[in-house]
From Swiss-Prot:
UniProt xrefs under Pfam families: zf-Paramyx-P
Positions that bind Zn(2+) 1: 178, 197, 222, 225
Gene: P/V
Region ranges (Disordered): 30-112
Family: Belongs to the paramyxoviruses V protein family.
GO biological process, one term: symbiont-mediated suppression of host JAK-STAT cascade via inhibition of STAT1 activity
Keyword Electron transport: no
UniProt-recorded name of the protein: Non-structural protein V
Source species of the chain: Human parainfluenza 4a virus (strain Toshiba) (HPIV-4a)
The keyword Zinc appears for this protein: yes
Amino acid sequence: MSFEISVEEIEELIETGNLNIDHALKELGATSQSSLNKPPSQSSRTEGNDGGTKISRNPAPVEAPAHTSTAQRSHNEENESGRQNLDSLSMISNKPQTGTLLMGSDTQLPSPSKTYQGLILDAKKRALNEPRRDQKITNEHGSMNDTRIFKRGEYRYQERGLGYTESEIKNTTPTPRHRREYSISWVNGRTTISEWCNPCCAPVKSTASVEKCTCGRCPKICELCIRDP
């Protein structure tokens, strides 16, 4: 099965294509592109001596609008500015980004558990580096070096470890000196550790408090609290 196309049909198809191209260029208001730069072929039919039909094509350039109209150009500029404004107002850019925090604060606070552990380690290091005082206590068991570090609630057990009986602990007059106390609190989302000295004759309380000397023999300042502000 074969198809034959006459010269008239070919010319009609070419003219129809040219009209479509011109109409598209006028609607878009764009200059002629490289893909549309092909010149339309205008066919002219000539009669040869041999009675045959010859087709000669004369290229003619396509006349595209040299520039867009003022209204079309202003419309394009408004659309472009509108897109830029929308991009600037949007929280998420339409362009791919890596390593950019779109919302939230720039810095992240450490978790309370990590902060608490770090403060505890610092307090332990300070306690180990603080100088200890050697005080001699004379009783029926003889002379001993007292290098105890006071801890809340452990004073009675330390006395037992040195050989004191329960009655001796109750009747013994405390040695005039200071004891170091600590308080751990949670303030404004952070763990804070406070430390201070209290006279040993003052009672030990469950709440943090600064006590005064009751025996009149405890020093006002010791080696531990001399560095306190």
